[in-house]
Amino acid sequence: MNKLETLQSALEARNDEILGYQINIDNYTRAIDKINVEHADNPAMIEFRDRLIEMLESHKTEQLKTIIIRDVIADQLTEMEAP
């Protein structure tokens, strides 16, 4: 596998990773909202919600890191494919 093929593969992997983070972000956000509405009086669920909030922030940060790396890979591909 040459550099171009490696970068193309890496770009696809980063896009999949970004999507995975987004699915988790969406799920955590919905779960937090659901707990706030339906289980606000349950201490165990509030504790779970608080852990979800921490995980949500962590996934947002990790997604941003992945976006940065994806963009750098895309820039390299553009440079390599330019005439």
Language-model-detected regions and their locations in the chain:
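Extended alpha-helical coiled-coil "stalk/arm" regions
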Residues: 18-49
